[in-house]
Amino acid sequence: MADKLTRIAIVNHDKCKPKKCRQECKKSCPVVRMGKLCIEVTPQSKIAWISETLCIGCGICIKKCPFGALSIVNLPSNLEKETTHRYCANAFKLHRLPIPRPGEVLGLVGTNGIGKSTALKILAGKQKPNLGKYDDPPDWQEILTYFRGSELQNYFTKILEDDLKAIIKPQYVDQIPKAAKGTVGSILDRKDETKTQAIVCQQLDLTHLKERNVEDLSGGELQRFACAVVCIQKADIFMFDEPSSYLDVKQRLKAAITIRSLINPDRYIIVVEHDLSVLDYLSDFICCLYGVPSAYGVVTMPFSVREGINIFLDGYVPTENLRFRDASLVFKVAETANEEEVKKMCMYKYPGMKKKMGEFELAIVAGEFTDSEIMVMLGENGTGKTTFIRMLAGRLKPDEGGEVPVLNVSYKPQKISPKSTGSVRQLLHEKIRDAYTHPQFVTDVMKPLQIENIIDQEVQTLSGGELQRVALALCLGKPADVYLIDEPSAYLDSEQRLMAARVVKRFILHAKKTAFVVEHDFIMATYLADRVIVFDGVPSKNTVANSPQTLLAGMNKFLSQLEITFRRDPNNYRPRINKLNSIKDVEQKKSGNYFFLDD
């Protein structure tokens, strides 16, 4: 019985429908044929049940199931013990827990569906860990005995005795208006227990929003409001689930500084974040999570910030001698053509233009772009990046200035609201029939974005990240001269972001087209950009879109507005933010090098 639990069977509750099939899984299972009850299911049962002790991992039932509801995952051999929580039979399980330390910020990094939010719930005391015994959950005494000798024992004892108060900033801020009613100011006044409301509001730019109703706030405003509500309450454990989605680069750093200002020798702070440069800036130490999404997740020991993120990118945990991803993710900045060479390939020009919308005025400096090139637009929210994209697409007419060249345009908007009823396959078939079966497109776009896994689901039931990937595939599948992509990384986890960036880059090179991308995730922006367009001015009053610059010049200009400096990690070249007023930071500001390309 040495290998009694070396695999784990997952039955998808949504897809398994015993009433509609002939129980192929049970009929084809060799163990059942030998007369053992490995798979139990009848046409009357709600869902199939698979015994993990009897299963031999042959994988026949997976292939036979007409709905694709089963998956059987072989576990690394050291995962029989240390189960922290399992939801029910044949469902997700989490191994170990991240270890928070008082007075420091713990960052969690890992893909979606790998148990970060479960870990947060358990550490907040909102979910009682059942140590894998889902049929008879243990009581707290047993749980404490189980964790004895680790820092978690003290932590859980404190939660039980001292009633440590935990607050979680939820992941999906767009759901907040359904729960919270009233103006921003009134809610903040109600929650303000530490009397720091004025300072926090100033840091997060919320002072001018106090009269607004919560349901009228945009995504970024809701995010800042949610962070503020958490920061002004009295608590011992602060948890932030993705505090940077919807925010632009400047606001991300402000949010990070606000979260770091909560540090106190007897407070625990835990952050889940997919933007690696923000995570780097925020955390004092990091736990990685690896495993198979929605099957099992494993938490590593805490590492230092740099080491933790590099381990996540390398896909290899040295302390456990375990590889959890085939390829490591490396950031080589693209070799950009010299300024002289670019001139020869010049294809398209756009004129200087002006556009006034209500109070807001945008001036665009004339520029030109070539094919096989990705332009990244850098600027805060409300500096007219989306307006510029819509003018290029011909959706908005300029008030003064020349005509925009008529181009075929494919546009992926920032907010994706699915209107279509039906499955993803039908949608792809309607919109991009030629592309989605084309072998080149399948290898370049469909496979890396993992559209296959969700192709038969209803479009209305997809999660944010799944919708984002479908939208990206639809956008790239439409034949066009120029692809306009607005925030391709929203809702995606760190690994999918890098995949998406790679997809866009490879597709643009192969198809010899141009792409304009709006992106706030710094790592993604540097990875994508051949040239950058910097937007400056006063947000939502009057702003200027400069003509395209090289990556180095543009980044220096943009970062000098934000007053941040970057260095490069020597191992995998990812950009890292320098801590404010550190030696490096002061040096680079003096010499005016805000951004480095050299290796």
From Swiss-Prot:
Annotated binding of ATP 1, by residue: 110-117
Cross-referenced SUPFAM superfamilies? 4Fe-4S ferredoxins, P-loop containing nucleoside triphosphate hydrolases
Alphabetically sorted, this entry's keywords are: 4Fe-4S, ATP-binding, Chaperone, Cytoplasm, Host-virus interaction, Hydrolase, Iron, Iron-sulfur, Isopeptide bond, Metal-binding, Mitochondrion, Nucleotide-binding, Phosphoprotein, Repeat, Translation regulation, Ubl conjugation
The Gene Ontology biological process terms listed for this entry are:
negative regulation of endoribonuclease activity; regulation of translation; rescue of stalled ribosome; ribosome disassembly; translational initiation; translational termination
Q: What is its main location?
A: cytoplasm
Q: Which residues bind ATP 2?
A: 379-386
Q: Which GO terms describe its molecular function?
A: 4 iron, 4 sulfur cluster binding; ATP binding; ATP hydrolysis activity; CTPase activity; endoribonuclease inhibitor activity; GTPase activity; iron ion binding; ribonucleoside triphosphate phosphatase activity
Q: Where is the ABC transporter domain?
A: 79-315, 342-562
PTMs per UniProt? Ubiquitinated by CNOT4. Ubiquitination mediates the recruitment of autophagy receptors to the mitochondrial outer membrane and initiates mitophagy.
Q: Which residues carry this modification: Phosphoserine?
A: 417
Where, per UniProt, does this protein localize? Cytoplasm; Mitochondrion
Q: Which Gene3D superfamilies match?
A: P-loop containing nucleotide triphosphate hydrolases
Residues the record lists as Phosphothreonine modifications: 550
This protein's source sits in the domain of life called Eukaryota
Cellular component terms (Gene Ontology)? cytoplasm; cytosol; cytosolic ribosome; membrane; mitochondrial matrix; mitochondrion
**Which residue range or ranges hold the 4Fe-4S ferredoxin-type domain?**
7-37, 46-75
Q: What EC number(s) does its UniProt record assign?
A: 3.6.5.-
Q: Which reaction does it catalyse?
A: GTP + H2O = GDP + phosphate + H(+); ATP + H2O = ADP + phosphate + H(+); CTP + H2O = CDP + phosphate + H(+); UTP + H2O = UDP + phosphate + H(+)
Which signals induce this protein?
Answer: Activated by encephalomyocarditis virus (EMCV) and HIV-1.
Q: Which residues cross the membrane?
A: none
- Record cross-link Glycyl lysine isopeptide (Lys-Gly) (interchain with G-Cter in ubiquitin), residues: 20
Q: What else is known?
A: The ABC transporter domains seem not to be functional.
Complexes and interactors: (Microbial infection) Interacts with Chandipura virus matrix protein.
User: Which family does the entry's similarity section mention?
Assistant: Belongs to the ABC transporter superfamily. ABCE family.
Q: What does this protein do?
A: Nucleoside-triphosphatase (NTPase) involved in ribosome recycling by mediating ribosome disassembly. Able to hydrolyze ATP, GTP, UTP and CTP. Splits ribosomes into free 60S subunits and tRNA- and mRNA-bound 40S subunits. Acts either after canonical termination facilitated by release factors (ETF1/eRF1) or after recognition of stalled and vacant ribosomes by mRNA surveillance factors (PELO/Pelota).
- Record protein name field: ATP-binding cassette sub-family E member 1
Q: Which gene encodes it?
A: ABCE1
